[in-house]
Amino acid sequence: MLPQRPQLLLLAGLLSLQSVLSQECTKYKVSTCRDCIESGPGCAWCQKLNFTGQGEPDSTRCDTRAQLLSKGCPADDIMEPKSLAETRQSQAGKQKQLSPEEVTLYLRPGQAAAFNVTFQRAKGYPIDLYYLMDLSYSMVDDLANVKKLGGDLLRALNDITESGRIGFGSFVDKTVLPFVNTHPEKLRNPCPNKEKECQPPFAFRHVLKLTDNSKQFETEVGKQLISGNLDAPEGGLDAMMQVAACPEEIGWRNVTRLLVFATDDGFHFAGDGKLGAILTPNDGRCHLEDNLYKSSNEFDYPSVGQLAHKLAESNIQPIFAVTKKMVKTYEKLTEIIPKSAVGELSEDSKNVVELIKSAYNKLSSRVFLDHNTLPDTLKVAYDSFCSNGVSQVDQPRGDCDGVQINVPITFQVKVTATECIQEQSFTIRALGFTDTVTVRVLPQCECQCREASRDRSVCGGRGSMECGVCRCDAGYIGKNCECQTHGRSSQELEGSCRKDNSSIICSGLGDCICGQCVCHTSDVPNKKIYGQFCECDNVNCERYDGQVCGGDKRGLCFCGTCRCNDQHEGSACQCLKSTQGCLNLDGVECSGRGRCRCNVCQCDPGYQPPLCIDCPGCPVPCAGFAPCTECLKFDKGPFAKNCSAACGQTKLLSSPVPGGRKCKERDSEGCWMTYTLVQRDGRNRYDVHVDDMLECVKGPNIAAIVGGTVGGVVLVGILLLAIWKALTHLSDLREYHRFEKEKLKSQWNNDNPLFKSATTTVMNPKFAES
């Protein structure tokens, strides 16, 4: 029952898709059946003779099947090519996991062609396993165990397949700073323990080509020595790229390919090479010389995306055997590299055989169906119907997990062309497997019209009938080739059908017949196209209430402009010709401060609807009406001699009116006038009510001001002199008291040091002796 479900879903999907696509046909500049087919998947062409009437364009023949049938086109005359898929199964006797082997598609633009691809996982499918090992110094214990793995690895493969082969390669890093120590002595022996024998560092060494000889594996791997480098990340991506890019050197067969990547650390990727002055991007090509990657110091590390593409292209499934601390790092890497797995490697690699078996079972139980790069004109989508009951629809690639041996799973592949394409091919494959499906794509854009329709008599003997349309001989044009050009070029005839030298003939809405436009009959009900250049119609006008020009009761559309009847106006005849809603209590339209449009006032700036009476933000013109107020009320001021002429529009009110604006301005004599302005209909038109009393202020007493000022200055001067005199007296008094105190302290008991006595006494020294 399982294979029937995808077929039923396929049929239902195609019927649903066809139903949706056939509901509409959007066409533009259609004159042939091919143009119609390219317009959209829902378009069909009627080849019936004389299907179009006078003035109808050839594009009338292009419509949905339902519309053509409703217009009287027989079903046998409807050209509607479909997208088709033809499959060719695999040759008998060949072990294939993917079928069919070849598919031929005939694609109509916009219409998908669908076909089924079946994958059946085979038991005992041949396997090639390449063991790629990190030989940096931290892997010294692991190398000792791997040297003994040859027999175990082959026995593990033989449990899975009848034909298994193993190979070996190793890597360290680029041999430049800062990746390795470039001191000559360190290059000879990079290990930290000088007594231990180590080999010089290298980027990648291909040690053993894929073989089924386990003894040879153990012999060659047994010769390997540990090496070393400086930084923690290793050059593993460099090595993986060479393993994928050198199939002949590695010895890959066209079978399942496994790459076991064993390490205890991270990896360098694109851009890290700049640290060692390596700027050239990795080219993804094979550069092995004497089994060594000698161009390592010339090319940067590959990017993860670049490596993922190369591995997928080579159908290589990587298994990352890494230590516990690196598991999460490489799990992130497997999210980018499809068909890859991660296993936790013990510190001494003793569990590597079980790790490989577990990872292989995980990889082989999941199938990704994908295709190579396609141009933008081709779109591919996958529907996956998996054996575990899970289904996915319209995915960029097929994906099924839990695939069991000899249990088929089905993928529905839908291919759509966006335009009429050139013949081309592409390949669908299950990632990690060698089987492919070759898809050949051909355009389905031509109409297989009846040969009988190529009768020249229908075209007056001056052309041939192709799919219901005349193709005229040279010198003749027209629907039935009835117009002779008389030596005039088609450009000259068409020139008279162009408006203002436009590039569009008859505005794109008619045919140029013998130099005159014959306008098309529109597909839109009640639409009429007319004019010398078919530039006019009766529907492309403004609409009101969902109708052109508000409907026939309001007006009619003439060449883009509404012509309203006597009761309506406006660009869409949306307004009644009435001003009733614009009149104020005095019957003035919009209070003289606006215009009435559609029975609604459009007020002048500042004035508010509905009747333009109030202007909250307008300034009160008090100062401007002060001269008229003075002459009207007090018969004085600048307008006193011609008050009636200058202020004839301003009326003096005898009593105050509520709602006016209070003003207070000076008259010509400096007195204050208090008055109220009452606005009338219109702009800047006011009546005025003036208070009887003027507020006049007496002038200042000049003599008092001058006398007071002079007296104040004199008094201030006298006061300053008195203050100065008092301060001087106090200072002298303080000095006098200090002198008196010093005088009392003085004592005159000592002799004058300058006085000399007039007598001198001299003693005879001999007198005492006698």
Curated annotation (Swiss-Prot):
Q: What is this protein called?
A: Integrin beta-2
- In this chain the VWFA domain maps to 124-363
Q: Which Gene3D superfamilies match?
A: 6.20.50.10, Cytochrome c1, transmembrane anchor, C-terminal (1.20.5.100), Laminin (2.10.25.10), ligand-binding face of the semaphorins, domain 2 (3.30.1680.10), ntegrin, alpha v. Chain A, domain 3 (2.60.40.1510), von Willebrand factor, type A domain (3.40.50.410)
Compartment(s) of residence: Cell membrane; Membrane raft
Provide the residue positions that the database annotates as binding Mg(2+): 136, 138, 234
Query: What PTMs does it carry?
Result: Both Ser-746 and Ser-757 become phosphorylated when T-cells are exposed to phorbol esters. Phosphorylation on Thr-759 (but not on Ser-757) allows interaction with 14-3-3 proteins.
| Record membrane topology | Single-pass type I membrane protein
Lineage top rank: taxon: Eukaryota
Glycosylated where? 50, 116, 254, 501, 642
Which residue pairs form cystines in this protein?
A: 25-43, 33-447, 36-62, 46-73, 191-198, 246-286, 386-400, 420-445, 449-467, 459-470, 472-481, 483-514, 497-512, 506-517, 519-534, 536-559, 541-557, 549-562, 564-573, 575-598, 582-596, 590-601, 603-612, 615-618, 622-663, 628-647, 631-643, 671-696
Q: Which GO terms fall under molecular function for this chain's record?
A: amyloid-beta binding; heat shock protein binding; ICAM-3 receptor activity; integrin binding; metal ion binding; protein kinase binding
Record-level GO cellular component terms: cell surface; focal adhesion; integrin alphaL-beta2 complex; integrin alphaM-beta2 complex; integrin alphaX-beta2 complex; membrane; plasma membrane raft
Q: How does it assemble?
A: Heterodimer of an alpha and a beta subunit. The ITGB2 beta subunit associates with the ITGAL, ITGAM, ITGAX or ITGAD alpha subunits. Found in a complex with CD177 and ITGAM/CD11b. Interacts with FGR. Interacts with COPS5 and RANBP9. Interacts with FLNA (via filamin repeats 4, 9, 12, 17, 19, 21, and 23). Interacts with THBD.
Residue limits of the I-EGF domain? Answer: 449-482, 483-535, 536-574, 575-613
Q: Which residues carry this modification: Pyrrolidone carboxylic acid?
A: 23
Q: What is the lineage of its organism?
A: Eukaryota, Metazoa, Chordata, Craniata, Vertebrata
Recorded name of the encoding gene = ITGB2
Keywords assigned by UniProt, alphabetized: Calcium, Cell adhesion, Cell membrane, Disulfide bond, EGF-like domain, Glycoprotein, Integrin, Magnesium, Membrane, Metal-binding, Phagocytosis, Phosphoprotein, Pyrrolidone carboxylic acid, Receptor, Repeat, Signal, Transmembrane, Transmembrane helix
Q: Which residues carry this modification: Phosphoserine?
A: 746, 757
Similarity comment: family membership: Belongs to the integrin beta chain family.
Q: Which GO terms describe its biological process?
A: cell adhesion mediated by integrin; cell-matrix adhesion; cellular response to low-density lipoprotein particle stimulus; endodermal cell differentiation; heterotypic cell-cell adhesion; integrin-mediated signaling pathway; leukocyte cell-cell adhesion; neutrophil chemotaxis
Cytoplasmic side of the membrane: what ranges? 725-770
- Alphabetical list of InterPro entries matching this protein: EGF_extracell, Integrin_b-2_sf, Integrin_beta_N, Integrin_bsu, Integrin_bsu_cyt_dom, Integrin_bsu_tail, Integrin_bsu_tail_dom_sf, Integrin_bsu_VWA
